[in-house]
């Protein structure tokens, strides 16, 4: 009987020690999970002497359990007084700390200085700077196109070898900005109108020329215009690259040469016909359909005339080009008698 009592006492003591270790382990884990504890609460009231059973509303530390077991509890009280089941819930220190941290954050937000309007001013300033770079259609017509118009006038009316006091860099910059601001279509239209107006004026001047000066003035007008294109086309190369070639599938130089053909050459070709009758051999070198149709019996004479023309051109500085690039079939066709007849097909 005594042995069974001793065994029961030992089992009860081990259970109490397990509860103590379990409580200490949970407290250690909570100390790592939760923020620092709140200020210490006032000490609990002393235990009532009439009862040795702990208050179930609060959890006794492990040390108090040991003290109760060692001093004031007998074996029966130890068996009956220890609470069974899960330990009571601890005080919600995490919720209290969360509320206090929220209050502290609110206090810091109130104490922080109010944002100054400098950031808003900087944003507005950068936006205004960006808007200042925008070229409206009014800006194009009042500022940019007048510069281009004046430069085109000087280029179209210059004489060979004359110095033109214009800034090519400034003109190219104007074209670049207008293309970037989506004014390519308007600028191309203005350029075509400008050059068309100039060519119409040249055509009227040629019509008013006396017959003996007509050919000479026509040659001067053609040379002056082709020389102007050598400067105008490079100035508008950005518009040509990103508008004419991509959207119109054409080339600026071809368009400007076509303008001269339509407004000057085609209008005055018939004025040259009376001169053609005076020297048909001369004009047949440059104008087709001047000579009568070729005759087979005169093929050798046609070949001799072609060879003579080639010699004259070489003497005057004209070259036949790189003959090594000619295909063998073309060379045979050129040396055959039929080639001479075909070369006179425009007679």
Curated annotation (Swiss-Prot):
The keyword Cell cycle applies. SUPFAM superfamilies: Cullin repeat-like (SSF74788). Residues 1-63, 320-347 are annotated as: Disordered. It comes from the Eukaryota. InterPro entries: CACUL1 (IPR042652), Cullin_N (IPR001373), Cullin_repeat-like_dom_sf (IPR016159). GO terms for biological process: G1/S transition of mitotic cell cycle; positive regulation of cell population proliferation; positive regulation of protein kinase activity; ubiquitin-dependent protein catabolic process. Residues 1-11 have a biased composition (Acidic residues). Residues 34-49 have a biased composition (Pro residues). GO terms for molecular function: protein kinase binding; ubiquitin protein ligase binding. Keywords: Cell cycle. Belongs to the cullin family. Cell cycle associated protein capable of promoting cell proliferation through the activation of CDK2 at the G1/S phase transition. Interacts with CDK2. This is CDK2-associated and cullin domain-containing protein 1. It comes from Rattus norvegicus. The lineage of its organism: Eukaryota, Metazoa, Chordata, Craniata, Vertebrata.
């Amino acid at each position: 009987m005594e042995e069974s009592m001793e065994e029961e006492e030992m089992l009860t003591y081990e259970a109490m020690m397990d509860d103590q270790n379990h409580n200490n382990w949970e407290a250690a884990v909570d100390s790592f999970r939760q923020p620092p504890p709140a200020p210490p609460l006032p000490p609990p009231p002393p235990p009532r002497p009439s009862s040795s059973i702990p208050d179930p509303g609060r959890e006794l530390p492990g040390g108090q359990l040991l003290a109760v077991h060692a001093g004031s509890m007998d074996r029966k009280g130890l068996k009956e007084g220890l609470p069974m089941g899960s330990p009571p819930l601890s005080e919600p220190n995490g919720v209290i700390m969360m509320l206090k941290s929220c209050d502290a954050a609110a206090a810091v937000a109130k104490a922080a200085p109010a944002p100054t309007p400098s950031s808003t001013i900087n944003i507005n300033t950068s936006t205004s700077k960006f808007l200042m770079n925008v070229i409206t259609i009014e800006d194009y017509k009042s500022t940019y196109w007048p510069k281009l118009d004046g430069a085109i006038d000087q280029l179209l009316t210059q004489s060979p070898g004359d110095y033109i006091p214009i800034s090519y860099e400034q003109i190219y910059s104007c074209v670049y900005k207008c293309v970037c601001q989506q004014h390519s279509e308007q600028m191309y239209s203005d350029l075509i109108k400008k050059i068309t107006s100039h060519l119409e004026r040249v055509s009227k001047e040629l019509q008013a020329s006396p017959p003996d000066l007509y050919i000479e003035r026509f040659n001067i007008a053609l040379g002056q215009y082709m020389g102007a294109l050598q400067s105008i086309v490079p100035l508008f190369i950005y518009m040509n690259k990103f508008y004419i070639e991509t959207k119109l599938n054409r080339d600026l130089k071809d368009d400007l040469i076509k303008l001269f053909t339509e407004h000057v050459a085609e209008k005055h070709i018939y004025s040259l016909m009376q001169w053609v009758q005076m020297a048909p051999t001369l004009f047949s070198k440059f104008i087709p359909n001047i000579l009568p149709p070729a005759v087979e019996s005169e093929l050798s004479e046609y070949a001799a005339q072609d060879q003579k023309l080639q010699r004259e051109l070489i003497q005057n500085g004209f070259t036949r080009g790189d003959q090594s690039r000619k295909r063998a079939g073309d060379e045979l066709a050129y040396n055959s008698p039929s080639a001479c007849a075909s070369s006179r097909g425009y007679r």
